[in-house]
């Protein structure tokens, strides 16, 4: 389980096909504190650590995850929102996030709104009815409040802190994000 509060902005170090896809991710986490078998949310999906070294860890990504998330489009150098699994007794600053992505949403617009940016998304039709005004969504693993809903579309506001510490700082119209 996760909170949707990103604690590191990692970078894909390498991608290798070995049956499943092995992805190495650079991180500022102290990898001495990461156990093999630990769960880390990587831009939304919960992935299992299978290897690690100083400043990086590796995960294996199944064909199912590649097909149903944005991870199939990752390349070396891509930025990745990272969150370690929550621990009992820690602050729940976002909302409860499972790391089981429901689908992929596409950014249809991004416009300034005060000091934030309003991102509008198009959600998969079979999932859109579950998105509620003032409810919570996790987009690329980031816990956000839904500020508008219309048809299959919904909007969220991204404050400057979120832009600076997540991949929302580089996302643009046409980009796709993992939706939970």
Label the predicted regions.
Residues 1-180:
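Conserved loop->alpha-helix
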